Curated annotation (Swiss-Prot):
<keyword id="KW-0997">Cell inner membrane</keyword>
<dbReference type="InterPro" id="IPR001807">
    <property type="entry name" value="ClC"/>
</dbReference>
<keyword id="KW-0868">Chloride</keyword>
<protein>
    <recommendedName>
        <fullName>Voltage-gated ClC-type chloride channel ClcB</fullName>
    </recommendedName>
</protein>
<keyword id="KW-0812">Transmembrane</keyword>
<feature type="transmembrane region" description="Helical">
    <location>
        <begin position="146"/>
        <end position="166"/>
    </location>
</feature>
<dbReference type="GO" id="GO:0005247">
    <property type="term" value="F:voltage-gated chloride channel activity"/>
</dbReference>
<dbReference type="InterPro" id="IPR014743">
    <property type="entry name" value="Cl-channel_core"/>
</dbReference>
<feature type="transmembrane region" description="Helical">
    <location>
        <begin position="258"/>
        <end position="278"/>
    </location>
</feature>
<feature type="transmembrane region" description="Helical">
    <location>
        <begin position="339"/>
        <end position="359"/>
    </location>
</feature>
<dbReference type="InterPro" id="IPR050368">
    <property type="entry name" value="ClC-type_chloride_channel"/>
</dbReference>
<dbReference type="GO" id="GO:0034707">
    <property type="term" value="C:chloride channel complex"/>
</dbReference>
<keyword id="KW-1003">Cell membrane</keyword>
<keyword id="KW-0851">Voltage-gated channel</keyword>
<keyword id="KW-0472">Membrane</keyword>
<dbReference type="Pfam" id="PF00654">
    <property type="entry name" value="Voltage_CLC"/>
</dbReference>
<feature type="transmembrane region" description="Helical">
    <location>
        <begin position="288"/>
        <end position="308"/>
    </location>
</feature>
Amino acid sequence: MFRRLLIATIIGILAALAVAGFRHAMLVLEWLFLRNDTGSLVNAATNLSPWRRLITPAVGGLAAGALLWGWQKMNQQRPHAPTDYMEALQTDGQFDYGASLVKSLASLLVVASGSAIGREGAMILLAALAASCFAQRCTPREEWKLWIACGAAAGMASAYHAPLAGSLFIAEILFGTLMLASLGPVVISAVVALLTTHLLSGGNALLYTVHLSLDLHVREYAMIISTGLVAGVCGPLFMWLMTTTHNGFIRLKLSPPWQLALGGFIVGLLSLLTPAVWGNGYSVVQSFLLSPPLLSVIAGIFICKLLAVLASSGSGAPGGVFTPTLFIGLSIGMLYGRMWGFWLPGADEMAILLGLTGMATLLAATTHAPMMSTLMICEMTGEYRLLPGLLIACVVASVLSRTLREDSVYRQHTAEH
C-alpha cells in the first residue's frame, strides 16, 4: 500500500510538470507570434489588426493539420495504438507515444493561434503520458491502467485546481476498467498535482473569482433546479450540433490541413464580430462572473462563441471541449437568469447564481457525471454553499440528458476519433 501511495505521489508531480510545460509552451508561442504576454487570447485578438485576427486561427489550423497529416502518412504501416487516455484505459494501458506527442503539439498550435477549443485535452493527455511512461518502467503491467488513471486525474486537477473533481472524473467517466478501491491513489495523485501546480505558479488557489452574496432560499433553489432542466435539454442539443458539424466537415472531403484551416478561418471571421470567440473562453467566463453583461451582449457573444466552438471541434482541431462547455453553460444560465431578472429583484446576483448553475448542469448533461460537475464548480469558485442545490440540478440535468441522448460527449468523442 505504501508503494502505491509513493508512486501516486510521483505521478502527481510528473503530471503537474507536464501541464506546466504545456502552459509555458503556450505563453512562448503567444509571445512569438502574437506579441501577447497577458496569457489571454481574447486580449491578443483585441490588439491585432482585423486581417491578422482573420487569418491567424486558419494558419494555426493549417500548421496543425499538416503536422497530423504528415505523421499519419509516415506511419501508415504501423499497427494502431491508443493516442488518447480514454482509449488506453479501455484497452491494455499502452500509448503510441510518438503519435500522442504529435497530437499534443498539434493541439498546442491550434490553441495558441486562437481556435475555440480547450487546452485541457492536451494537458490531461500529457499528464497521462507522463504517468504511463513512468509506469511502464517501474511498475508491473497489470497496474498500468491504474497509473494512467492517476495521471489523467492529476492532469485535470492541475488544469482546473479541482482535485476532488479530477478524481471523480475518473470514477464517473473512466472507471469502467478500474475497481473503486483504486480511488485512493487517484486522489493522492490529484492532490499532489494541485499542490505542485501552486508551488510552481504561486497563483490563486481558485480558478475563478466570484463575488456572490445572494442568500439561498426556496426561490433560489427552485431557479437552480429549473436551470438543470434547461441544461438537460441543451446538453443533448449541443452534442447533436457537434456531431452534425463534424459530419458536415467530413462530407467536404478535405485533407486534414485544409479541414483544420477552414475551421480556423471560420473562427477568424467570427472574431471580426467579437474577439471573445478566440481561445477556450476562460477569460470571458471570468469577466462575466465579475460583471454580468446585459442580456443582448450575452446573447451576441454566446451565438458567436457557440459557432466558433462548433467550427473548431467539427473540423477536428485536437483539444478539449471541457472549458468551452463551461462557457456555453455559463451563457445559457446567465441568459436564463437575465430573463427572470425582468421580474425578480437582484438581477446581477441572479445572473451569477444561474450562470454558475449553468456551468455545472451543462457539464453534467454532456458528461453524464453529476457529482464531478458539481464538485468542479465548487472547487473552481470556492462557492461550496451551492453544493446541495447544484448536486440536485446536475442529477436532474444528467438524467434528462441521458433520456434524450444515450451517449455522453466522451463516448461521442471516442466514436468520432
